[in-house]
């Protein structure tokens, strides 16, 4: 059965016993993602990956398929995040109370949060929850500098300066690059797929999705998306893939080519989103594939 995410950003955990004491901020219906990120040590951030703690994240209003229940936990599939792990979408576990059974909300238009984060407001002007970039909300009307939107909580508001109407037109390579550049300096987060932090493939997935493209969630799957491009014929907007053993092993990283021999990417734990010159870096040796996923 399909359920709707009611937390601003919910972690998709590897298993019900995956969360650590430091992860309690993300186990409540109203998650405290800023507190979680600010209090995690470097080792705890690294452990999200090395200890296989989380798989990905989902945003407020997204639909997930519940496949099983185990106490306070539910096994879910995220249809909006294509993955080789399951043909239906990305699998993992969530806290049951971060979801709600809802009927589909149908309006003629949607708006998308375009800032890294933005508040959802009640009609009296009180802030309700802080939403992430890429959160999509059904639009009801425009009122006094706000978008009135439909949510699982009822009618709410977001500032027009914090969101944009969802366009049916796909963005250009330059649009994708500009979307990504907006996040320069944002610290890397393993499993991250929100304006509070991205991993390498979550960053690519998100900036392409913001421009109307659906690509898989993980780098290994993204390396099969779009069309292949010779390594010496890359264009700005292409996805660059990197593999161990100087490009001959397993793919472990993805970035966005921005032209001029430079790449925009979310590097690794302890680093932040940056534009990097590829020459004389480990990435120059590890480059193994180029894929074009935008419309030319």
UniProtKB/Swiss-Prot annotation:
Protein name: Gamma-D-glutamyl-L-lysine dipeptidyl-peptidase
Purpose: Specifically hydrolyzes gamma-D-glutamyl-L-lysine bonds in murein peptides, releasing L-Ala-D-Glu.
Triggers of expression: Repressed by AbrB, a transcription factor that negatively controls biofilm formation.
Annotated pathway: Cell wall degradation; peptidoglycan degradation
UniProt record, GO biological process: cell wall macromolecule catabolic process; cell wall organization; peptidoglycan metabolic process; proteolysis
Keywords: Cell wall biogenesis/degradation, Hydrolase, Protease, Thiol protease
Organism this protein belongs to: Bacillus subtilis (strain 168)
InterPro entries, per the entry: NLP_P60_dom (IPR000064), Papain-like_cys_pep_sf (IPR038765), Peptidase_C40 (IPR051202)
């Amino acid at each position: 059965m399909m359920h709707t995410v009611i937390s601003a950003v919910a972690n998709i955990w590897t298993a019900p016993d995956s969360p650590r004491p430091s992860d309690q901020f993300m186990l409540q219906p109203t998650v405290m993602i800023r507190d979680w990120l600010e209090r995690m040590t470097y080792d705890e951030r690294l452990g999200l990956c090395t200890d296989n703690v989380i798989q990905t994240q989902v945003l407020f209003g997204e639909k997930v398929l519940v496949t099983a229940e185990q106490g306070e936990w539910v096994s879910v599939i995220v249809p909006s995040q294509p993955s080789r792990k399951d043909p239906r979408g990305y699998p993992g576990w969530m806290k049951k109370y971060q979801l709600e059974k809802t009927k589909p909300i149908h309006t003629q238009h949607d708006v998308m949060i375009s800032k890294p984060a933005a508040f959802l407001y009640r009609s009296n002007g009180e802030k309700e929850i802080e939403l992430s970039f890429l959160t999509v909300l059904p639009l009801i009307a425009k009122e006094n500098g706000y978008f009135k939107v439909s949510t699982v909580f009822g009618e709410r508001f977001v500032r027009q300066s914090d969101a944009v109407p969802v366009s049916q037109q796909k963005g250009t390579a330059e649009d994708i690059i500009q979307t990504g550049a907006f996040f320069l300096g944002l610290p890397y987060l393993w499993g991250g797929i929100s304006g509070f932090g991205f991993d390498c493939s979550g960053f690519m997935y998100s900036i392409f999705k913001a421009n109307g493209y659906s690509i898989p969630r993980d780098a290994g799957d993204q390396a099969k998306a779009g069309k292949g491009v010779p390594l010496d014929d890359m264009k700005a907007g292409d996805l660059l893939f990197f593999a161990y053993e100087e490009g001959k092993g397993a793919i472990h990283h993805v970035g966005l080519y921005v032209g001029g021999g430079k790449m925009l990417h979310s590097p690794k734990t302890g680093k932040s989103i940056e534009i990097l010159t590829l020459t004389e870096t480990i990435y120059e040796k590890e480059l193994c594939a180029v894929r074009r996923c935008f419309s030319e």
